[in-house]
Amino acid sequence: MSSVKIVEQYKARLISIIGELFTVLTKGSNVAQDAILDCISNAIIILYILSERLGYSHTAVDESMKKNLREGLSEEDKHDNDLRRLYSHLKERH
């Protein structure tokens, strides 16, 4: 199977996962937490695989995310705990 076809399959799978997440979220509080977590983790997995297929290492993706988070922290409200917590999590991994 060609590399382009594999990338296209991963892209289609990612869109499918995001659609599934939106569907699960519309079900309200009756949704199993595992279903939400599975969608989120599967999307992250596909994005890491796609990045590798496109020639980027997992470390390069992590470093880019940290850079973007640092920039977001400097541009956003200094009290934005979501960005700060994610940045701290990524720093601890590497």
Q: What would you call each of these model-derived segments?
A:
Residues 1-40, 44-94:
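Flexible "arm" and connector segments at domain edges
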